């Protein structure tokens, strides 16, 4: 399957004079302290560090909130900052008028009381939000850029629907994890267009909620390889009790495993002696022949990381940082890409990366539930051209 034909990504460059702030709407599940709504929209309202300082050239003019828990912040923030708190998504985009009155939309379907399915997916209303946003654009005859927090779907059928709708509308569309642009320890990456001989990914926490972060972080490194990205041919999910067997079979590169485990705060013996029953050992078989194990190790690993051996023989391992100060800064770097898209009309980097990893995770969760069967993924042969995009701290928040 080729790329989905959404508006092409462009890399940002340079510094410049202060631009006019673009008005944006936001559609969120909940708005409470330290929610994704807070750590993204709060940076529009209060600056990159959420301390009243400089921030993006965006203005939040309207907000739709789907659920109002006791700890809701949106009502008081609307009074303080003057944005419109809306009863419908259409109102958020039109400000109650007869036209699209904003230049961009942030859709944040994360947190809140929503059901789970039998595959362990938390069914946030990301498709419903996206459908109502794009229905409103169609109704009023104007398309503006949309950012979807985390992965589309989360079910693959819904992610595919969203991709097709974006293609039909020629919608500038971004999605994905803040961890792809976060700080790394150590600060290392695969050189642009370097070949990859082997790789290992490590994740922690829930298979759905943090599996997507793990897969997308790994993908933002692997997409840089010399073959470009041609997509995924098959996936399989095994129990963590099979990790020792996978090592014996050569499915996991031994040195890379040790490097990746050390980078994420654990070690081989801790994992092999007591593999977490609520984890999983994922295998991702790429179209170009690369097969990558991704081990989800809740209670063992202390973070998300990867170890890579490139075709020169160089080995490196890195862990993504999830800093809390100054107020979850990786979300500032995510917001920087969103700001770029809203000002240029072009995604800062390809949505296909997130779409691919969303599909990989969905199929892996199915494999895990259905007796660990290997799944041929003809629908994940998603080819795309990556962007040589920076991550913290190499991305300038004051760049225009």
Task: Give, region by region, the residue ranges found by the protein language model.
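Beta-strand-loop-alpha-helix segment that lines the small-molecule cofactor/substrate pocket
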Residues: 110-179
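A structured beta-alpha segment of the ubiquitous adenosine-cofactor-binding alpha/beta core
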Residues: 81-115, 129-138
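NAD(P)-binding Rossmann-fold cofactor-contacting core
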Residues: 34, 52-79
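A short, Lys/Arg-enriched amphipathic alpha-helix followed by its capping loop at the start of a domain
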Residues: 39-58
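Short beta-strand segments enriched in small/hydrophobic residues
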Residues: 21-30, 198-201
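Rossmann-like dinucleotide-binding domain that binds NAD(P)(H)
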Residues: 199-290, 296-299, 356-359
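N-terminal export signals
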Residues: 1-16
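C-terminal helical cap and adjacent loop that interface with cofactors, partners, or active-site loops
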Residues: 19, 72, 300-400
């Amino acid at each position: 399957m080729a790329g989905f034909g959404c508006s092409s990504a462009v890399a940002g460059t340079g510094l410049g004079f202060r631009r006019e702030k673009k008005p944006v709407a936001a559609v969120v599940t909940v708005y409470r302290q330290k929610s994704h709504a807070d750590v993204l929209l709060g940076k529009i309202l209060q600056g990159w560090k959420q301390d009243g300082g400089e921030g993006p050239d965006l203005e939040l003019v309207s907000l739709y909130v789907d659920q109002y828990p006791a700890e809701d912040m949106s009502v008081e923030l609307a009074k303080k900052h003057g944005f419109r708190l809306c009863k419908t998504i259409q109102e958020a985009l039109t400000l109650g008028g007869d036209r699209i009155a904003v230049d961009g939309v942030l859709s944040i379907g994360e947190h809140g009381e929503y059901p789970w399915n039998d595959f362990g997916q938390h069914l946030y209303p990301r498709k419903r939000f996206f459908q109502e946003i794009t229905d409103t654009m169609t109704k009023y005859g104007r398309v503006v850029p949309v950012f979807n927090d985390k992965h589309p779907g989360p079910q693959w059928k819904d992610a595919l629907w969203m991709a097709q709708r974006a293609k039909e509308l020629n919608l500038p569309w971004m999605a994905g994890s803040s961890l792809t642009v976060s700080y790394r320890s150590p600060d290392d990456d695969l050189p642009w267009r370097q070949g990859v001989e082997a790789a290992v990914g490590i994740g922690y926490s829930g298979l759905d909620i943090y599996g997507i972060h793990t897969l997308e972080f790994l993908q933002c490194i692997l997409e840089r390889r010399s073959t470009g990205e041609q997509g995924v041919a098959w996936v399989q999910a095994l129990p963590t009790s099979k990790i020792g067997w996978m090592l014996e079979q050569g499915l996991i590169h031994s040195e890379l495993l040790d490097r990746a485990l050390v980078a994420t705060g654990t070690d081989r013996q801790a994992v092999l002696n007591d593999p977490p029953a609520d984890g999983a050992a994922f295998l991702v078989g790429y179209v170009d022949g690369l097969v990558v194990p991704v081990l989800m190790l809740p209670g063992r690993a202390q973070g998300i990381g990867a170890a890579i051996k490139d075709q020169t023989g160089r080995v490196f391992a890195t862990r993504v940082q999830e800093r809390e100060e100054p107020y979850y800064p990786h979300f500032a770097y995510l917001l920087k890409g969103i700001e770029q898209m809203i000002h240029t009309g072009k995604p800062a980097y390809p949505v296909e990366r997130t779409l691919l990893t969303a599909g990989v995770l969905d199929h892996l969760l199915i494999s895990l539930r259905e007796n660990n069967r290997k799944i041929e993924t003809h629908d994940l042969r998603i080819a795309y051209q990556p962007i040589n995009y920076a991550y913290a701290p190499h991305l300038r928040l004051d760049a225009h």
